[in-house]
Amino acid sequence: MFVVRKGNPRGIHDWPDLIKENISVITPNPRTSGNGQLSVLAAWGSVVTRGGTETDARSFLTALFRNVAALDSGARGATNTFSVQRLGDVHLTWENEAINEVDANKGELEIVYPPVSIRAEPAVAWVDANLSDPKRAAIARAYLEYLFTDEAQEVAAQHGYRPFKPEILARHSNTLPAIAQFPITAIASSWDDARQKFFSDNGIYETIPRNTDRGTTTFASDRQGR
């Protein structure tokens, strides 16, 4: 999602607005941050899922990172850069992080929901090697089963995560409004394929042209997380 200054003074509503002249974007470094990687994937998908070619998407990604003002190593560092240091016009982040950021900066920030973004689904896994003890396995199974109950889905929604149950999501439409979300399979065959395609040594992110206009070989400074 996009977090912008109160009143959205730069008129940012959709992905193409991020590449306009003099727009300053904050996002974590895709080399070190899952949030940063999602920004890349969402930006790419915003082009190819709306009729653009991969050539168009590469051009868009190049223009986007030309407007990135700083690449913090993690999501929290990027949040601090945008909301505390007040650098940038727009911050790209997870929806739940955006909600927390706006709440923590009452009256100063607001969320913009672009027409389309990527569907990011946090995973939960059962690890056999850690659950050889029957009692521990029973507790783990109970927890996993609980996550899919209405009660747990309601808790998730209250913390800014979209429930997978439509009827529960509908009850939170004021804070989790409708938005078109494309799956990873719209831009790669799987998450593993996406990591290879975009973030390997020869991946798309590593091979898009660098911004030399600022006298540096990278798009923006690689800042350490805070």
What are the functions of these language-model segments?
Residues 214-226:
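Acidic, low-complexity segments
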Residues 45, 49-115:
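Ligand-binding pocket segment of bilobal, Venus flytrap-like solute-binding proteins
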Residues 1-3, 110, 123-125:
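Residues embedded in well-ordered beta-strands
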Residues 10-13, 34-38, 42, 56-63, ...:
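Extracytoplasmic/secreted proteins, especially bacterial periplasmic and envelope-associated proteins
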